[in-house]
Each structure stands twice: as structure tokens, then as C-alpha cells.
């Protein structure tokens, strides 16, 4: 069974508010060679008899988190379109999860991402990956301080329920 079929079978056990045909289409849209660099999506390589290595880092940010985030971006876009709604995602990151979230949400209609990260506290690769992403709905914000300072800002917004509702904010605390 290919990864697309397996993902659909598992997701369909838990997602009952998206028609099966639509869910299958979203899974097929997500797990493509164009996104993951290979038709196998998660290639399995035999190292020796009975020992295999599965590659989970073929996505756009080279992080295993792309496996879930890419699907999440498509699910968000689908759901928001059905509801004629918009969403502002406000998060904090110290590395690859922020990049995976941004690359998953780039170009998605009705979604904007505001991602805080500690200024000069991430690897050069992670900083370049995030801050070179040019997309009108992705906003990278470098914060003087450490990751905990970024997280504190997200928690403050998360705890202001009136503000979150008015601004249509989904806050992501542990990225």
C-alpha cells in the first residue's frame, strides 16, 4: 500500500466531516513527488538483511515535520474555504518546525502566518530557510531575546480570548 492510500485509510478513521472523495483528493494533493522529491514520498532503503532505513526528510524543509505539516496546510485551506473563513496563525519557533509550518501554509488562501523566532539564536540554515521565504501570507518576526521570550508573547495572545476571537488567531505554543 502506498503512503497516500495508507494516509487516507488512517485519516478516514478520524475525520468524518470531510467527504471521503475530498479527503482522498487532499491526501493525493499533499503527498506528491513535486513536494517530496520522489514518487515514493518516504523511500525505504535496505541496509542489510532485516534492517531498513526510511527517509522522512524529503519535504520542502528537509524536516520530518513536513510529513504532517504539508497535509495540515491543505486541510486548513479546505476547511476555511468551506466555512468562508480566514485564520491568522501566531507561533514561536527556534528552528525547523517553524519552517515546516511556514512552507505548509505558504500560498494558502485565507491563511496568514506570523512566526516569532529568537534573533540570531537559530542555525544559519534555519534562519535562511525561514527568512528567505517570500510569500505574501508569511511574516517572520525576529525577537531580541531567547525562545522563551517568543513563547511568552504567544502565550499572552493565547490567553486573551477576546483578542484571539476578534483577530481570528490560532496560537501555536510549542513549535
Predicted regions mapped to residue ranges:
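Conserved small/polar residues in nucleotide/adenosyl-binding loops
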Residues: 1-5, 173-175
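N-terminal entrance/gating region of PLP-dependent enzymes' catalytic architecture
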Residues: 4-62
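Predominant activation on well-ordered alpha-helical scaffold segments within soluble catalytic domains
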Residues: 8, 12, 70-73, 151, ...
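Generic secondary-structure signature for well-ordered alpha-helical cores
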Residues: 12, 16, 32, 77, ...
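Acidic-glycine-rich active-site phosphate/pyrophosphate-binding loop
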Residues: 41-49, 67-68, 158-165
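Well-ordered mid-protein domain cores that form the structural environment of catalytic cofactors
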Residues: 51-107
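Glycine/threonine-rich beta-strand-loop-alpha-helix active-site module
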Residues: 86-136
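Small/polar-residue-rich loop-to-helix segments that shape phosphate-bearing ligand pockets
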Residues: 116-173
Amino acid at each position: 500500500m502506498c503512503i497516500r492510500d495508507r494516509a487516507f485509510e488512517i485519516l478516514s478513521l478520524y475525520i468524518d466531516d470531510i467527504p471521503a472523495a475530498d479527503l482522498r483528493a487532499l491526501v493525493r494533493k499533499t503527498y506528491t513527488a513535486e513536494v517530496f522529491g520522489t514518487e515514493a514520498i518516504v523511500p525505504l532503503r535496505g541496509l542489510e538483511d532485516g534492517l531498513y532505513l526510511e527517509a522522512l526528510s524529503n519535504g520542502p524543509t528537509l524536516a520530518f515535520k513536513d510529513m504532517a505539516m504539508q497535509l495540515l496546510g491543505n486541510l486548513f485551506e479546505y476547511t476555511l474555504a468551506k466555512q468562508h473563513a480566514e485564520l491568522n496563525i501566531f507561533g514561536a519557533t527556534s528552528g525547523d518546525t517553524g519552517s515546516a509550518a511556514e512552507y505548509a501554509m505558504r500560498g494558502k488562501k485565507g491563511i496568514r502566518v506570523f512566526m516569532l523566532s529568537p534573533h540570531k539564536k537559530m542555525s544559519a540554515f534555519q534562519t535562511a530557510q525561514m527568512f528567505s521565504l517570500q510569500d505574501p501570507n508569511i511574516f517572520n518576526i525576529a525577537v531580541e531575546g531567547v525562545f522563551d521570550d517568543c513563547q511568552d508573547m504567544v502565550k499572552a495572545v493565547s490567553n486573551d480570548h477576546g483578542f484571539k476571537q476578534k483577530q481570528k488567531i490560532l496560537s501555536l505554543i510549542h513549535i
